[in-house]
Curated annotation (Swiss-Prot):
GO terms for biological process: carbohydrate metabolic process. GO terms for molecular function: alpha-galactosidase activity; carbohydrate binding. It is found in: Secreted. The active site is at D152 (nucleophile), D210 (proton donor). It comes from Aspergillus fumigatus (strain ATCC MYA-4609 / CBS 101355 / FGSC A1100 / Af293) (Neosartorya fumigata). It is an enzyme of class 3 (hydrolase). This is Probable alpha-galactosidase A. It holds the Pfam family Melibiase_C. Glycans are attached at N47, N91, N121, N201. It catalyses: Hydrolysis of terminal, non-reducing alpha-D-galactose residues in alpha-D-galactosides, including galactose oligosaccharides, galactomannans and galactolipids. Keywords: Disulfide bond, Glycoprotein, Glycosidase, Hydrolase, Lectin, Secreted, Signal. Residues 410-531 form the Ricin B-type lectin domain. One of its GO terms (cellular component) is extracellular region. The keyword Hydrolase applies.
Length: 532
């Protein structure tokens, strides 16, 4: 059965140049998407009834009103064969009324509709991939009423003597060139980076991350979140994707969003505290809030997590910044970022298995001591005023999130946090004297750095001193000379403005290479990022 031929002729006429996707046109997806996807909960067990029941439940539970306005179909929705004209066909058993009918029904209820395809010759589930049919598939999806495309990366093999990374780039670039010609470009979710997220060597991963923001609006960057029937620890799976996301903050900006995968609030392997933590962390990252759960069966506690207005407001903040690590201890992470209107966000995670009590000085938040900061707990709404520090008690795997209002006289924020090697996870450490090195992060102020607008890095342990370049990296009294200025690039390198050498774990400083693991670093949110 040819399910698309009659619809395609109407679309060809509107495939005209109008706008670009990605960072060149941030208005296409100005804030992270919110909605539902079937994969982590149901995998290939999807059908028309599931999506109708899900949409109905999203309306009755208030999720649509809260902002969850997307319903996305993942793999296995299609027939195993293309039609006679090579167009894609839906599985008529799973979708007896057809995808166009389903899309119209969902849109009439207030939802946007997304769909899944693959850059290879087959999808991950063995269904027809888009390779060689990209323009036709884009036309098909638009004709069906689809406005969001998740493009996976299974079964991609190099062509024309290209490397594997070059092949992925060519295919995703080709899709981008097609989508940007559309009158209404589809939101483009790229899965390419996930196929290069090898912790043994991150260089190829970063090569891919360098180009995905130019082609699409968001990218699935690493491992899949644990599916409902999967083996292993769901919490460990969340922490793996959380860690990967902390390595990529420099890429996120208006028009491009890092995607650490789905929210899984009904996973049986998670405690309620862990479900709250995943939501709080994803919101702090301004990550997509795409729920993969049985929506009609969510408990009142799970729904309360997903409908938290304050955390949704953080996630949807128009600045689009990603929270970054102000401090990392053996068990506790402290993350911060700025919000629209000048507020600061403070997020504190207890990764450990026991109760943790942590004191967070205002300096760790990039603020100055002695000012009356109004702090609101975004879980319970409690408000307090602090001038020096906040003391937080956290249960195992719990996360607290605070919104901090700054008085006008104390509105200056200095980007502050750890400088860590993204491959090893080790922190740049002021070792006293003039020595500087990389050590396991331990939550010490010798590992927390202030980064000025001019590129001076000062350890909180002695802010009169600066990271200094020369024959080796050192910490010396700040003289604000050029050898104490550092430029942070989108590739993750930290280059000394005087020597033009790069900070390097293991040797301290060396000739700048191309995204070498030893030279790629995470810095605090708010630091100026150079193109390269």
């Amino acid at each position: 059965m040819d399910t698309t031929k009659s619809l395609l002729s109407t679309l060809i006429a509107i495939m005209i140049p109008l706008s670009l996707g990605s960072v060149s046109s941030p208005n296409l997806l100005p804030t992270p998407p919110m909605g539902f996807n079937n994969w982590a909960r149901f995998m290939c067990d999807l059908n028309e009834t599931l999506f109708l029941e899900t949409a109905s439940a999203m309306i009755s539970t208030g999720l649509l009103e809260a902002g969850y306005n997307r319903v996305n179909l993942d793999d296995c929705w299609m027939a195993y064969d293309r039609a006679a004209d090579s167009s894609l066909q839906w599985n008529t058993t799973k979708f007896p009324h057809g995808i166009p009918w389903l899309a119209r029904h969902l849109k009439a209820q207030g939802f946007h509709v997304g769909i899944y395809e693959d850059a290879g010759n087959l999808t991950c589930g063995g269904y027809p991939g888009s390779f060689g049919h990209e323009a036709l598939d884009a036309q098909t999806f638009a004709a069906w009423g689809i406005d969001y495309l998740k493009l996976d990366g299974c079964n991609v093999f190099p062509e024309h003597s290209r490397t594997l990374e070059e092949e992925y780039k060519a295919r995703y670039a080709h899709w981008h060139s097609i989508l940007k010609q559309m009158h209404h470009p589809l939101i483009f979710s790229e899965s390419a980076p996930a196929y290069f997220a090898d912790p043994a060597n991150l260089t190829s991963w970063y090569e891919v991350m360098d180009w995905v923001p130019a082609f699409g609006e968001l990218a699935r960057h690493s491992t899949d979140i644990l599916v409902y029937v999967g083996e292993g620890s769901a919490w460990d799976s969340i922490m793996v994707n959380y860690r990967y996301n902390t390595l990529l903050a420099r890429y996120q900006r208006p028009g491009y969003i890092n995607d650490p995968d789905f929210l899984i609030p009904d996973h049986p392997g998670l405690t309620l505290e862990e479900k709250r933590s995943q939501f709080a962390l994803w919101a702090s990252f301004s990550a997509p809030l795409i729920v993969s759960a049985y929506i009609p069966g969510l408990s009142s506690e799970e729904l309360a997590i997903l409908r938290n207005e304050e955390l949704i407001r953080v996630d949807q903040d128009v600045l689009g910044l990603q929270a970054t690590l102000a401090s990392r201890g053996l068990e506790v992470d402290v993350l911060t970022r700025s919000l629209e209107g000048g507020d600061r966000l403070l997020t504190v995670l207890n990764r450990g298995d026991g109760v943790a009590v942590v004191s967070v000085p205002v300096e760790w938040m990039g603020l100055q001591r002695g000012c009356p900061y109004v702090v609101k707990n975004l879980w319970d709404g409690e408000v307090q005023v602090l001038e020096e520090e906040i003391v937080i008690r956290l249960n195992s795997h719990a996360t607290q999130v605070y919104r901090i209002a700054l008085p006008d006289e104390c509105s200056t924020v200095i980007p502050t946090g750890i400088v860590f090697n993204t491959a090893s996870g080790n922190c740049l450490t002021d070792e006293n004297g003039e020595r500087v090195g990389f050590e396991a992060c331990r939550g010490s102020e010798t590992q927390i750095w202030q980064v000025s607008e001019l590129g001076y890095l000062r350890p909180l342990s002695r802010t009169s001193h600066c990271l200094t370049g020369g024959s080796q990296a050192s910490v010396q009294l700040c003289t604000e000379q050029k050898n104490q200025q550092w430029a942070y690039a989108i590739t993750g390198i930290l280059k000394n403005e005087h020597t033009e050498m790069c900070l390097t774990e293991g040797t301290g400083i060396s000739q700048c290479g191309f995204e070498r693991d030893s030279q790629v670093f995470g810095l605090p949110s708010g630091v100026d990022i150079k193109p390269s």
